[in-house]
């Protein structure tokens, strides 16, 4: 229904209401019939469905397959169900952790929304009552005044200089002056753009000036905001870089496990020398059991726990992560497209300069000649520019409330965009004083005098030139400049028309104001530059203001361009793709421009983050690799589509989150390299032993190492602090595989190294037990191999504190890793030396000398890896890479 094309009286009748509103009974009936006035929350999956989603992870599927095979072995061969129980325990813990962390983020978002739960003043039974905005129904008459959030869509039916900011919907930050008259469609015009419907008010917008009333035409999902929310709910999310890499890793592990099965199965058949059913079944079971033991059971849980730790750390830094895997995506961010207002700046217009003889007199005049108000706690409400003037006066000891008592308003000529000024009349001890404020060029032209030593003296050309120079100097700094003048009346004039009041004025002064940058953002931008991250400013503000802020922050580099939305619209796709990397500032942009900008960067292969707060920002946030919503000023729709919500709306928080994302990805890589290197050593050891015809370790031994010896140090690696160079590296390309940067080589050589040490320990144990060097089964050899493998992998976890740095010169400590290592050593020792445990695991307790030798051999690996890292660092320096 196009209510903006209808007379207000007709709209009221069509909605079965009246200018005195609905009756309480009718409102309750409509509420019961149509539901609450709120946006439908995104349909939440049940706990069961959330758990099933966690189980759909490729790494988890491999573990479930391993558990199934182990279960078959247990049933058919009478084996223990220990393997099955342990693997399923790991799977359940991983799934529960994932669900818990993501629900925790949703609860944080809900808490933010509850903090901003709104109320509305409505007419019910002809009386003004305050109700929760979600209880509004179609036909309610809502009273609007400065500072109110518009709670639903409605037709304006009363207007007293009403101005509404609709930036959340239209992207246009300039408040829209509203009226009551109908809007007529021109020939061939099917609809009127939302921003031009000046007799309508929409959910998500804010009243910044004046008063008025509207009759509610649409609530909840039927509002314009609701329609956008519904469209966004249909869009699907893509995979994060980490999800893609873990999927690739799962495929590699799957083929590796299958390869192990085939090779060991073939070797067992050849050694058996026959193809009887019993031989084939036995060979198959041995191959499968060893392959199951070769899977890094703790990897999925480690990744989930590391991500969860990162999410917790980020929440402490005001970044609420809504998707667990999005944490890592932040680490490879290459471009951050940021709003200006509130994110780079303080979202608070502030007077930073003035011109005039008397600052106190100028502040008093400006504060009285505006409609912004201040409460007892110093909180100012009103149109941003006027709020800045009242706040400025307050800092000078001129409280607006006190000023109003001393100089009560007795008349006014409201602001008009045609006149570009407003005037107010106030009772004063010597009669009536008039204050007029507005555009400098207009005010100056109406001034015949200026204030000097508290007296009005005739305006001179020299002083007029001085005023104009000051005005230009402020404007050149991208300040918003207002002029103020006064006029003294002996008594209140009979005629308060502007033509009567606004002449023969006495100039008082100029104020220059700007939304100042957040003090911490400059350092954050510098940190982005050092980290190889490009910051792009996107704003609905004027281009001159945007450029001034961008230069101050260092966003606008030498040779970079600033373009307006209009200029962007004139560029075709080919031109824009050729130019976009040279553009650092976009001003006066529309919502569709933001999506176009994000798409251009993504198409060029850059991992892109996009911030936003309004409903109109939601599509661009959804289209970015990392959508960042605002927790304070952001709409619910924007928060719901974002991957991350900033609780403080601060750009510096994004940079902190990027650093945390890099740390998390580093730690995940460290854990993966540690676990895969350890598992490779197990696979090689078992493979060599199988080829040579002896048993070095049993599957249960490998499962113990994977889940006890390896898992806790791997988790501790996830708590490793960020390395000193983490924000001096270039962002890693999202397409880089999990084994990029030489990690594949490292896993291979470290796996070979540890397996060589384990085999050496086995033969030393065999020699100590038998006194001869032969290739046969040995109880002492198996125990020593187990001790060496455990010790080598525990020591290897310390190597992994830095993939290239020397662990002996690291300035930080990892207490969690130290305790995990000590616990793993103690558990390994108990399993081998306590008789009933040793018997359960098939070990023969060894002598103290054998124990020391086995552990000593295991420690050799750490020294050798550090020596190799020394050569790797030298190679990196030659290539000019950051260490």
Predicted regions and their residues:
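A glycine- and small/hydrophobic-rich beta-loop-beta segment
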Residues: 777
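Transmembrane alpha-helix/helix-exit interface in multi-pass inner-membrane proteins
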Residues: 264, 755-763
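Conserved cytosolic headpiece of P-type ATPases
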Residues: 1-731, 736-739, 752, 767, ...
């Amino acid at each position: 229904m196009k209510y903006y094309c209808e007379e207000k009286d007709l709209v009221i009748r069509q909605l079965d209401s009246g200018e005195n509103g609905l009756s309480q009974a009718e409102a309750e009936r409509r509420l019961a019939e149509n539901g609450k006035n709120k946006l439908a929350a995104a349909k939440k999956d049940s706990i069961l469905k959330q758990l099933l989603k966690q189980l759909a992870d490729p790494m988890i599927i491999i573990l479930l397959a391993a558990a199934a095979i182990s279960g078959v072995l247990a049933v058919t061969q009478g084996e223990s169900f220990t393997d099955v129980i342990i693997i399923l325990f790991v799977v359940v813990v991983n799934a529960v952790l994932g669900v818990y962390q993501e629900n925790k983020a949703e609860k944080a978002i809900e808490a933010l929304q509850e903090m901003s739960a709104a109320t509305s003043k409505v007419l019910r039974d002809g009386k003004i009552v305050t109700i929760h905005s979600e209880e509004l129904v179609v036909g309610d008459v809502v009273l609007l005044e400065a500072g109110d959030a518009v709670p639903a869509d409605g037709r304006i039916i009363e207007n007293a200089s009403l101005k509404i900011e609709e930036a959340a919907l239209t992207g246009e930050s300039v408040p829209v002056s509203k009226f009551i008259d109908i809007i007529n469609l021109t020939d061939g015009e099917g609809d009127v753009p939302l921003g031009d419907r000046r007799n309508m008010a929409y959910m998500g917008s804010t009243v910044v000036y004046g008063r008025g009333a509207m009759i509610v035409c649409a609530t909840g999902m039927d509002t314009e905001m609701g329609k956008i929310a519904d469209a966004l709910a249909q869009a699907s999310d893509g995979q994060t870089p980490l999800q893609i890499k873990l999927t690739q890793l799962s495929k590699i592990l799957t083929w590796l496990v299958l390869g192990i099965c085939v090779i060991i199965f073939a070797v067992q058949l050849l050694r058996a020398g026959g193809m009887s059913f019993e031989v084939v079944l036995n060979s198959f079971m041995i191959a499968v059991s060893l392959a199951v033991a070769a899977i890094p059971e703790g990897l999925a849980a480690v990744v989930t726990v590391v991500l969860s730790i990162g999410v917790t750390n980020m929440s402490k830094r005001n970044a609420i992560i809504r998707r667990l895997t999005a944490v890592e995506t932040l680490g490879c961010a290459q471009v951050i497209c940021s709003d200006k207002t509130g994110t780079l700046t303080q979202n608070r217009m502030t007077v930073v300069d003035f011109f005039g003889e008397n600052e106190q007199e100028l502040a008093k005049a400006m504060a009285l000649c505006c409609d912004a108000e201040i409460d007892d706690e110093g909180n100012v409400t009103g149109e941003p520019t006027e709020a800045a003037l009242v706040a400025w006066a307050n800092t000078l000891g001129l409280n607006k409330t006190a000023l109003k008592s001393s100089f009560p308003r007795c008349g006014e000529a409201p602001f008009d965009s045609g006149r570009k000024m407003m005037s107010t009349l106030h009772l004063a001890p010597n009669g009536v004083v008039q204050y007029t404020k507005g555009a400098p060029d207009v005010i100056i032209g109406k001034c015949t005098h200026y204030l000097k030593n508290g007296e009005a003296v005739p305006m001179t050309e020299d002083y007029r030139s001085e005023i104009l120079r000051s005005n230009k100097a402020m404007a050149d700094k991208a300040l918003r400049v207002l002029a103020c003048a006064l006029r003294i009346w002996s008594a209140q004039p009979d005629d308060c028309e502007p033509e009567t009041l606004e002449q023969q004025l006495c100039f008082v002064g100029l104020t220059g104001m700007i939304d100042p940058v957040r003090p911490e953002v400059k350092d954050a931008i510098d940190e982005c530059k050092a980290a190889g991250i490009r910051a792009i400013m996107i704003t609905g503000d004027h281009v001159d203001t945007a450029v001034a802020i961008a230069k101050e922050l260092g966003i606008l580099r030498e040779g970079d361009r600033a373009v307006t939305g209009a200029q962007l619209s004139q560029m075709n796709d080919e031109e824009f793709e050729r130019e976009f990397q040279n553009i650092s500032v976009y001003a006066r942009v529309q919502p569709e421009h933001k999506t176009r900008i994000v798409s251009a960067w993504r198409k060029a292969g850059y991992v892109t983050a996009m911030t936003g707060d309004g409903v109109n920002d939601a599509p661009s946030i959804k289209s970015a690799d990392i959508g960042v919503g605002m927790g304070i000023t952001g709409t619910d729709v924007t928060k719901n589509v974002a991957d991350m919500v900033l609780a403080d709306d601060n750009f510096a928080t994004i940079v902190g989150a990027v650093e945390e994302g890099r740390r998390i990805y580093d730690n995940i890589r460290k854990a993966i390299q540690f676990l895969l290197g350890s598992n490779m050593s197990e696979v090689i050891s078992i493979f060599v032993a199988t080829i040579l015809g002896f048993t070095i370790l049993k599957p249960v031994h490998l499962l113990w190492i994977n889940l006890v010896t390896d898992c806790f140090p791997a988790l501790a690696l996830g708590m490793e602090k960020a390395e000193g160079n983490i924000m001096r590296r270039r962002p890693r390309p999202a397409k880089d595989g999990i084994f990029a940067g030489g990690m594949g080589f490292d896993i291979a050589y470290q796996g070979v190294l540890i397996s060589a040490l384990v085999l050496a320990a086995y033969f030393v144990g065999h020699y100590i037990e038998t006194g001869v060097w032969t290739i046969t089964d040995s109880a002492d050899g198996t125990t020593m191999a187990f001790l060496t493998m455990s010790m080598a992998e525990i020591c290897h976890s310390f190597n992994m504190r830095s993939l290239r740095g020397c662990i002996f010169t690291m300035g930080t400590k990892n207490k969690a890793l130290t305790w995990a290592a000590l616990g793993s050593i103690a558990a390994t020792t108990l399993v081998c030396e306590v008789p009933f445990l040793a018997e359960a695991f098939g070990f023969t307790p060894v002598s103290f000398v054998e124990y020391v030798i086995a552990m000593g051999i295991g420690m050799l690996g750490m020294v050798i890896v550090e020596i190799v890292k020394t050569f790797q660092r030298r190679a990196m320096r030659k290539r000019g890479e950051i260490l």
